[in-house]
Amino acid sequence: MYQIFFFFLPLLHSYASAQTPPPFRNGDLVANFEPSLAVVTGVLAIMFALTFVLLVYAKCCHIDLRSGSGDRRRHDRRLRQGIFFNRSTASSDRFSGLDKTAIESLPLFRFSALKGSKQGLDCSVCLSKFESVEILRLLPKCRHAFHIGCIDQWLEQHATCPLCRDRVSMEEDSSVLTNGNSFRFLNQSEIREDSSLELYIEREEEEERIHREELSGSSRFSIGESFRKILKLGNKEKTLLDEHVNDKDEKKLMHKFNHRIVVSDVVFKNRWSNVSSSDLMFLNSEMVNSISSERFSSLDHVKRGDEEDQIGILRIKEEMEAKRMLENKLTSMTTMFSSENGDSGSKSRSVMIEPGRRSVSDITAVPRLSISIHGDCSGSAAETASALQNGGNETEERRRRLWLPIARKTAQWFANREKRSQINTTHQHFDV
């Protein structure tokens, strides 16, 4: 600003000296006044004012642009490193790091023990590739791994993951890997590759990330142009494009930072080493007991704890008992009737026929001949005896015809009811 002022000062002096009029009297000076000097002074003042305003504006805008470009460069660098920086959380997390004991309690593992596609995998803090002999520290909640020195230095000042910005909580992290032998393998004192646990890595493909960014709307015009180009291609170009796509599928690029390590505590290398023969015998006995219980007392297992179903089972059992009692009564009645008829027939036959003259047919209660005894009984007496015997047989047959259908229907009704109850219970068991 001062340089510009000193630059215009000689010009102003020379112009003023050139415009100085010859000495006049006081009256002539007032009469012959020319406003050229005032105009020049006003123009120069305006120029100086505009110059000053422009300098101030340029200085302020230059500071803002420089600070904005610096923030943008820092933001781009953090994005390249995979750290999504948040200004609101940066100030709060800067001095809210974890304790040293908490950091040292985080699990460790060797990079060579990791299974899966681990080629080109980098540490998102120092941007260097992992080596097979290096020991990495795992954040159990988000399952991201880093170098020990990198993550320890980071966690001293921040309580979040440098990759996904997820907060590291020791209470939640300790509950993730305390199932069985998981935390034992990942402990610092037992870092080895022959453990029963297996570590797998899940990585995001670079194509998926690009596709997700395209779907967000940032490159929708380029997508439309690429589709138009593909539609305009001929058969030869399409075949070349297909070959290029196939080669690209064979050589899929994995993202360097977006990964997730899965700890598998289910797949064991020596999973049968701790099983003894007594355990197998106990297992077999338990299987036999369960099968036998399911076979012989399936209703009890299905209806256990349900009072209504137990009452229904008791009712079925009572009905079965009543059915058995009815059948027993019917059989006893039939046997009684048959025995009474047999006794009456035998008595009549003993009166009619002498013991020495009885035949086989008389023993079987089917008399073929009606023989008079001692000639005292006439033919009418024999006819009356045979009529009595036939009448007893007819009453027995009538009773059988009357009771047997009733007993058969009753037994069939109880049997059908029992079958229906069993079918319903089995259907309920399968539905459960």
From Swiss-Prot:
* Zn finger region (RING-type): 123-165
Q: Which UniProt keywords apply?
A: Membrane, Metal-binding, Signal, Transferase, Transmembrane, Transmembrane helix, Ubl conjugation pathway, Zinc, Zinc-finger
Q: Where in the cell is it found?
A: Membrane
- Signal peptide range equals 1-18
GO CC annotation:
membrane
Write down the EC number: 2.3.2.27
Q: Name one GO biological process term.
A: protein ubiquitination
Tell me the route in metabolism or biology where this protein functions: Protein modification; protein ubiquitination
Say which family it is in: Belongs to the RING-type zinc finger family. ATL subfamily.
Name of the protein this chain belongs to: E3 ubiquitin-protein ligase ATL42
Gene that specifies this protein: ATL42
